[in-house]
A protein has these predicted regions:
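ADP-ribose/adenylate-binding Rossmann-like module
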Residues: 103, 107, 116-136
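Glycine-rich phosphate-binding loop and adjoining beta1-alpha1-beta2 segment
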Residues: 42-75
Length: 435
């Protein structure tokens, strides 16, 4: 069994951004360039490159990053590697040159696995920003043992899905004196006068994910995990649409990967570190009754069309129409991103020190908050890059074995939360029990 041996020393690059010319990839390039020029790498430097199919598009990404950051040297100093996800030999050649790949090649259900496979086979770590539970859990099922043997870390969901939620649960747990047994999170998005939108790549992932729910159920049956033990009182699930007294808004269950990722983290911590698992539910606020009506109508359309091939093709072709403008082929403008932010409130409950969680009702509560800039294309690159930096800088604090990990599973013993705090994604305690 290999331990912490992947990402062989002496490779040309430490980090490689694959899919750098994609909509999200371009912002990952900008964030990585900013961090590489910062204090942490001022003396040692950071060797990194960009990779993709089209040289001219990659050159354009570097040019725009150079202009945005006032760093003209990027255009000449950052190497470009030509690589096609559909060409295994080009993936192998790329992986052999770098310690870790930052994979921005979504939808991951179509393009993610070849990258993971090449990374595992070539002893290269892989970080992605997928929010697709079937892909994430499928990579665990297929590659966890191989990655462990190679000493390689494959770490998924390292963007807005699901770093704030996964690390937020750990932050909340660590700030409660006693045993945290359950958390509800409420995610709110904030935008400026021009509103906001999301690039349709995320929309496509949602469409395909919904249409393949049976596949996810079958995969989980194949994995065959036993249910996690419930510590303390069993958490009650909310309705499909409900009014949140905590946030004074209507809310719905969060449809991303957060619940899947957090549950996998809690399983890893319970089975490997004997830490008490935390029950977790995730919700999104939607505002007042008018927003609820609009959401229900859009949701019914989505449910109807996503079931059939022809309907899915219409949803993909006309994202702006079917999502009421929330998803577009162009993505948000820079002004929209500058004016947008997110807040995730976490309401936890548990048992005080000395109190048996199996006896009686929870007797302590805690409220924490994770907040940051625009979620998809500002916070996501921040999270992804800080995950990569932590992987490079704190290898000894990662799990002893390689494998396919969640962010919380990989980084629970590192300073990742501290790094995120320093770079714009802030974790704070709002209220805690009296000592």
């Amino acid at each position: 069994m290999a331990t912490r041996g992947g990402g062989a020393a002496g490779r040309t690059y430490e980090l490689m951004v694959l899919g750098a010319s994609g909509f999200t990839g371009q912002f990952v390039v900008q964030e990585l360039a900013r961090v590489a020029a910062g204090d942490e790498f001022r003396s040692s430097g950071l060797r990194w490159a960009v990779a993709g199919r089209n040289r001219s598009k990659l050159e354009d990404v570097l040019r725009r990053a150079a202009e945005a950051l006032g760093m003209p040297q990027l255009k000449s100093e950052i190497d470009i590697i030509i690589c096609d996800v559909g060409d295994p030999s080009s993936l192998d050649a790329m992986c052999k040159q770098t310690t870790a790949v930052l994979s921005c090649v979504g939808p991951y259900r179509f393009y993610g696995e070849p990258v993971v496979k090449a990374c595992v086979e070539n002893g290269t770590h892989c970080i992605d920003i997928s929010g697709e539970p079937k892909y994430l859990e499928g990579m665990y099922f297929k590659y966890n043992s191989q990655a462990a043997d190679k000493g390689v870390y494959i770490i998924g969901s390292c963007g807005f899905d699901s770093v704030p939620a996964d690390l937020g649960v750990l932050f909340t747990r660590d700030n409660l004196k006693g045993t945290l047994t359950a958390i509800e999170s409420f995610l709110s998005f904030h935008s400026g006068p021009e509103g906001t939108c999301i690039h349709d790549g995320t929309w496509q992932s949602a469409i395909y994910g919904f249409s393949d729910q049976d596949g996810l159920r079958k995969l989980r049956k194949q994995i065959g995990h036993k249910p996690l033990p419930i510590i303390g009182a069993k958490q009650k699930r909310r309705g499909t649409v409900f009014y949140s007294d905590e946030l004074k808004q209507y809310s719905i269950p969060f449809l991303g990967s957060d619940v899947s990722v957090v549950k996998r983290t809690q399983r890893y911590l319970y089975e490997n570190l004997e830490e008490a698992p935390v029950q977790y539910s995730a919700y999104t606020t939607v505002g007042g009754i008018a927003s609820v009506v609009k959401l229900i109508f859009a949701g019914l359309l989505f449910l109807l069309f996503a079931k059939f091939s022809f309907g899915r093709s219409l949803l993909i072709k006309y994202p702006k129409f079917f999502s009421f403008g929330y998803f577009t082929k162009e993505g948000p403008t820079q002004k929209q991103m500058n004016d947008s932010s997110f807040t995730m409130m976490m309401f936890g409950e548990g048992y005080s020190e000395g109190q048996d969680p199996q006896q009686g009702k929870p007797n302590v509560k805690i409220c924490t908050q994770v907040k940051g800039p625009e979620a998809g294309y500002v916070a996501t690159p921040i999270a992804m890059v800080q995950v990569a930096v932590t992987l490079l800088k704190e290898r000894s604090s990662l799990p002893q074995r390689g494998g396919v990990y969640t962010p919380g599973g990989a980084f629970s013993k590192t300073k990742l939360i501290e790094r995120l705090n320093q770079n714009g994604i802030q974790f704070t305690v709002i209220t805690r029990p009296e000592a």
